[in-house]
Amino acid sequence: MAGEGINEDYPVEIHEYLSTFENSIGAVDEMLKTMMSVSRNELLQKLDPLEQAKVDLVSAYTLNSMFWVYLATQGVNPKEHPVKQELERIRVYMNRVKEITDKKKAGKLDRGAASRFVKNALWEPKPKNASKVANKGKSKN
């Protein structure tokens, strides 16, 4: 398929899909070469624990996804293979990491600052003279 004419072994209708698939495989191959050019220990030493978990999860998900594709190309239904449960398990952990990341990004309430803000924004003390004047006016009636 590397630039030759259309092969007679498969229908013409799927030629574009096969070309796209071949390009995707090439892109994945390049990404894997880049990722594997640095030792795992070197990579993980530069990252905090949360980032390490993300790298491990993405690696596991990628590997299992590639195995899913391999099974499909071999005529095995990957939905009935244990790889499906493994992918679901990895997704659960990915969601947990996402929740942790979201919690870190979420704003935190400073109760003291909030109370001062509300007090200063809403509360206005009555002038002492105004209350005496009001009382005198009521007592004269």
From Swiss-Prot:
Protein's UniProt name: Nuclear nucleic acid-binding protein C1D
Taxonomic source organism: Bos taurus (Bovine)
Lineage of the species this protein comes from: Eukaryota, Metazoa, Chordata, Craniata, Vertebrata
Protein family per UniProt: Belongs to the C1D family.
Gene name, Swiss-Prot/TrEMBL: C1D
GO molecular function terms noted in the UniProt entry: DNA binding; RNA binding
Keywords: Apoptosis, Cytoplasm, DNA-binding, Isopeptide bond, Nucleus, Phosphoprotein, Repressor, RNA-binding, rRNA processing, Transcription, Transcription regulation, Ubl conjugation
Pfam family, one: Sas10_Utp3
GO cellular component: cytoplasm; exosome (RNase complex); nucleolus
Secretion signal, residue range per the UniProt entry: none
